[in-house]
Amino acid sequence: MSSKESCGKKETSQRKDTTTSSPNFGEKDKKERKTPASSTSSSSIRSVSSEKRKLKSDHTDVLYYNIKRRQGLKRLSVEIDTLRRRPKIGSSSQRPIKLKEASYSNDNQIILQSPSSNGTKKDIHKCVDFKPKDIKLTNAGSKLDHGIKSLSSPKIASDVKPKAEGQASENKWSHLLVQREKMKELKKGRNSKFRDNSEKCVLEKWKRNQFSQDYNSNKIIKEPLGSRRQKISFKIPIKSRDTLQKLVEENVFNIDSNNSKTKQEEREYLESSQVSLNVTRQKTEHLLSDFTYKRTVHEWKRKHHYDHQESNDSHSRENLTQSFEAPCCSVSSESIQDADQEMQIVEELHAARVGKSVDLPGELMSMEIDLEDDVHSSSANNTSDRKLLIVIDTNILMNHLKFVRILKTTEVPGFDKLVLIIPWVVMQELDRMKEGKLLKRAQHKAIPAVHFINDSLKNQDRKLWGQSIQLASQKHYGLSDENNDDRVLKCCLQHQELFPCSFVILCTDDRNLRNKGLISGVKSLSKEELSAELLHLSLNTDVCHQPCIPKQQLKAETTPLKESYKEESTNSGLSILLESIVSDLEKSLGTGLSSILETEMKIAFGNLWMEILYLKPPWTLLHLLQCFKKHWLAVFGLVMEKNLLLTIESLYKNLRKANKAVDFTTVKFLLQDSRSLLHAFSTRSNYDGILPQTFAQVNNLLQTFAEVKTKLKPNSSENTVTKKQEGTSLKNSHNQEITVFSSSHLPQPSRHQEIWSILESVWITIYQNSTDVFQRLGSNSALTTSNIASFEEAFICLQKLMAAVRDILEGIQRILAPNSNYQDVETLYNFLIKYEVNKNVKFTAQEIYDCVSQTEYREKLTIGCRQLVEMEYTMQQCNASVYMEAKNRGWCEDMLNYRI
């Protein structure tokens, strides 16, 4: 074999050894350190035997081999340079991240490998954060020596040892040592130059990146919020971290020695740019948070531009922060305890006023404005204009808006008209509560009040005035307006001065504000007190603080108007009382229906009932009725009679009508339907004792309604009868007997109500007696208290009740038949006459037939019939359970025949 071929093979073997991966290289270095410089006999035999196939001992070929070897050492120097720079990355283990190792393929592509021993790959989750001061090029010479020593181990000797004698090998090794010393000096000079150049590049790039960082930050500040967020998300994606890391690794492990300086500059530029990106991102986040805060404060100041005192800026921010932290109420407190919620609104509003959370602007209160002659001042000069001015506080508008609506349409005797006055501070408080900034839980009550004021002012309603900003800015009697209570009181005093012949009343539920008003000479009443006061007002009331009209003139004017005032008083008193009844009915019935709704929904759906519920709390009575209608088929229709849905629909329709305009007939149907609905559910459960209390409250309202009917209805009925008499006398002057006969009887609707009330009393009697019987005959009779003393007495009473229910059902079923006539009423009429509880029956069978022929009462009779059927079935079940015991005791057979 020639020397060229041997050198070619040697060069090929060297290239294979030098192109191996770095981990294998390290392992071989460890093995070679253990081997001594002079090879042992075994290693020399292996090396000689291997070299016999590769080299020949030809001295002429050694010179050619040295030339090839010199070229191989140049390649080896490049790899040594690569190994020199690899420990630089590995030595920085104290830095926040670790770079992955890389092995090279033939296409100069980087293959990332995990540095962990177990072979699992690790992801880099932190951004590469290189700083210029961390870039150090020290210890390069020692690492270079370490790399050269590792390469000059016996492995190279074993690969390049020729087959010649020991002298030739010693010459070659001496030549290699000389080459190694030259390479060492060359690398030292190159490292010093490289270190100086790299430090200069780092300083220049740092200055350049600092300038670009300032430019980017200034550019971000000038951009709007939306575009800035898009740019930030575009410039700093998560994937860019891996890209930056890959670029750094390429710069570190690049084998091209000519481009090493350029790659090093690029790596340093990327490091410095990453530093600038991190700093920019931190500043940008700070700017975004600062800008968001400033924008929130700016919007708050823009909405409340009147508050421009610099001394109140910090206080305003605290109030703004506290206004968004309103606690949430539970379902029970929202739906059941309406009265407690009203008192809570009053207390929190008073606390906010005392704490100056809703102060008016200071400059506005110190303004000096010349008032123009408006309607208020011109009407003050009119001595014949007598008004009842009622100043409405915020809590009245929120808690009793329906009362305010009725009050606006009320005609009070002794006054030309009634006017509602809304203070300026009340409108400001409603505005803040409407937006949820003062009392967030009262937001749903503030919005209707704002709409009511807006509709009245927009329609130029003369019965509602608003205090102007000019009046609100004036100082009155030296008042300093320490809180909003004083501003409301100042509004009352101003109108007393502007209208001396009018009577000013302050209506508020705030007890302390009423105390201030009474001390200041302003009559102050709550909602209930004002309702009672309006009923007792008459012409004898002192209208003026200083009488402007002589008493004789006043009497002369009032004498011809007594009848009209009396009629107005009747209508006003009736509307106010009816509104009070409806308001109390909404509270009491809402309490009972909310308990029923919650209990039945929990039974049907368990813990998911709130998610399935049609309307979420807080509820009104209309909301509850809507929920009953919506869930009737799935929940209530399964446990109650289907005809009860008609009662719910009638109750819903009449309640909506009462919210628009209350009248006598609507309130009557509301009370009757409410009692029927509660009674139907009472057969299922008492719902933790809430249903009996609600039933008692509805009965009290029915008694109050009956008293109102006896006081106010006869007058109106007499007037209607008189009008009918006048009309008939004009048309039929020859027939006066008809009018006299009609005046001696009650109107037909009142007669029907009387008949129906007797039927209801019969049902109540049967229901109460059956309850006592069931308690005595039940299994837990020892634990319950009953009005029936003994078991035998209860059994006898049960037989009588079963017979009575059977007779009533027979009479009602004959009336409800499709082809019923007058004779079918006799069965029911005979039953009413027979029993002692109805001795006061003073109507005929014809009147009963006329009553039950009406559609309204026929529907109610149908519902009552179904309730009696259920009652009869329950009685039969109870009788079957105690029949054997009664038979064993040997009671009379006549008594047991009631069971048939």
From Swiss-Prot:
Q: Where is the sequence biased in composition, kind Low complexity?
A: 38-48
Entry's Gene Ontology cellular component terms: nucleus
Ranges where the PINc domain occurs: 388-515
Q: Where is the composition biased (Basic and acidic residues)?
A: 1-18, 26-35
| InterPro entries, per the entry | PIN-like_dom_sf, PIN_dom, SWT1_Regulator
- SUPFAM superfamilies annotated for this entry? PIN domain-like
Q: Which residues form the signal peptide?
A: none
Tissue specificity, per the record, is:
Expressed weakly in testis.
Q: Name one Pfam family in it.
A: PIN_4
Q: Where is this region: Disordered?
A: 1-54
Q: What family does this chain come from, according to its entry?
A: Belongs to the SWT1 family.
Name it.
Answer: Transcriptional protein SWT1
Tell me what organism the protein belongs to.
Homo sapiens (Human)
Q: What is the lineage of its organism?
A: Eukaryota, Metazoa, Chordata, Craniata, Vertebrata
> By which gene is this protein encoded?
SWT1
